[in-house]
Structures are given as C-alpha cells and as structure tokens.
Amino acid sequence: MPIVSGFKVGPIGFGLMGLTWKPKQTPDEEAFEVMNYALSQGSNYWDAGEFYGVDPPTSNLDLLARYFEKYPENANKVFLSVKGGLDFKTLVPDGNPDFVSKSVENVIAHLRGTKKLDLFQCARVDPNVPIETTMKTLKGFVDSGKISCVGLSEVSAETIKRAHAVVPIAAVEVEYSLFSRDIETNGIMDICRKLSIPIIAYSPFCRGLLTGRIKTVEDLKEFAKSFPFLEYLDRFSPDVFAKNLPFLQAVEQLAKKFGMTMPEFSLLFIMASGNGLVIPIPGSTSVSRTKSNLNALNKSLSPEQFKEAKEVLSKYPIYGLRYNEQLAGTLSV
C-alpha cells in the first residue's frame, strides 16, 4: 500500500468535489453511501476542498463534518486532504501568511472536531508570494499539531524543491491522465521520485472524456449540460473534441484489446507510469461508478501491454489546453 506521511492509503483514492460543487449537491444519504463504500474497499485517501461548494462554498467540509458525526468510527480510517488558500469569490490564490492561516483555521472549524485535518495544501500557488513564506506558515500548523502534514497542488518542479526545503512535502497533487501527461516531461515526476513524494492524480478521466460515455460531439454536448463549467475548457469545445476523437478511439481499442473498460485502462496506465508513485483520486456520486473505478485493482497492465500502449498513443497528438488560455497561468507555478 502507498504511504502518505506515515499513513497507509489505498492505491486509488476518492475525490469528493463532485458531491457538492454543483448547483444541487448530492443528498447526504446518497453521498454517505458512496463514501462508506469507497472506504470499505480501501479507498481511504479522501480529497476535499474548502471552496468545493456553491451555497455555501464550504459545503464539502460541512458534508464531511456531518459524515464523521454519523460515523465517528471512520475518522481514524480516513486520510483527509483539503485544498484551500483561494478567495471564495474570485478563486484567486493568496499565499500571504494571514490569508493562509485563516484558511487552515476555517477548514478546522468547519470540520467541527469530527476529524483531524491530515493534510492541507493551497489549491494554487500565489505567484506574488515566495513559496517559502507560505510554507513557513503551514509548518507552524504542523509544529503545533493542528495539521499532520503539508501538500502542494499544481506546482512546478522548482517550487516543489523550494517548498520541500522548508517543510517536508507529503504529497503533490496535479492533473494527470492519458490526456494530460505533462508531469512525465516537465520534471515533476522526476523530482517527486527523487524526494519520494507521492503524486496525487486528479481528473484521471479528464473530466469524463475517458469514461467511455462520450464518443460523439452530441454525447459531449449532452454530458456538458450537467457540468456547465466544462464549456469553458478547451477540450470540451466541439471543434477540439473532434480533433481528439482519433486519440479517444485508440484508447478505447487498447482497453478492449487488454480486456478492460476505458476507466480501468486509464487508471492502470497512469499508475504504471508512476511505478507506485501515483495515487489517482477519481470522484463519483454513485456506488456503481465507484465500484467500476475500483475494479481497476482487479486487473493488471503487463509491462508489454504498457509499452504497446505508450507506442500506440504516441502516434496521436493531443489538442487543446488542460483548462484554457486564461487559466493556464495558474498551473504548474
């Protein structure tokens, strides 16, 4: 089992964003069922956010507090990672000590004493504040015992090195999927391997593109109706999607050849790339989909299959940015 800051976690984690960050959040009964199922299957690295809600922004944390109030016996079984450090209204990062401190304290307050905050990470790096300044602030919370450890999200390899020199970095969260493999070449995977820092892979299905449910432009438009923010992302533009269809079809063909679903293949590929370093955190709002995701652990990708997949997929260029031109500047800072 992977280890994050001395805590044994399952090889596939669980992202909670989709349970609350939408106009109508998942009812508690349904959310608790999914959370309990994930935990029962060993998926105990839970990824949450201080701002993962609409009304109020803290809905994700409030859901967790209600969950642990109902299931206090599960608090010590879960490793809880929470992202914060963003202005709720603008979602702009603020790495100043006062702002970061208030963010950590707000997360702790909303958990209402039901669960310790295991890992805190700023969701994005504030380019106007030296990373050392932000890390010194968070180190103070570790030293006081208010949080167990510190993580980083959407950072560059150089920032990881600088931050790690101030406080041990327990995990680095980045987007990583068959569509977004930047970390293999931009130094992030190399520095994390060198420093033995686990990589937490968010959006391992590229926000739905790798689930097997989106095969045509019509499918894309229908899918995006449930997630309005997708229309702002490059790869959900019908024109860009059409250019990426050959790649998607190649993924589907490889999955079938290897006796897997697209989600299973997508997870196993990035896990194999990390060679034990990568922990994907797919999200889900249903037990059936969570079960489907975790079924990847019942399959395996042989070294020969992994090599074949890399060779096949390298023939297809990927079109579109991970987000869009406006948001690109907030990534890998």
UniProtKB/Swiss-Prot annotation:
PTM annotation (Phosphoserine): residues: S292
EC annotation from Swiss-Prot or TrEMBL: 1.1.1.65
CDD domains listed in its UniProt record: AKR_AKR8A1-2
Keyword Ribosomal protein: no
Pathway: Cofactor degradation; B6 vitamer degradation; pyridoxal from pyridoxine (dehydrogenase route): step 1/1
Entry's localization field: Cytoplasm
Main location class: cytoplasm
Record note on quaternary structure: Monomer.
Name of the molecule in the record: Pyridoxal reductase
Naturally occurring in which organism (per UniProt): Schizosaccharomyces pombe (strain 972 / ATCC 24843) (Fission yeast)
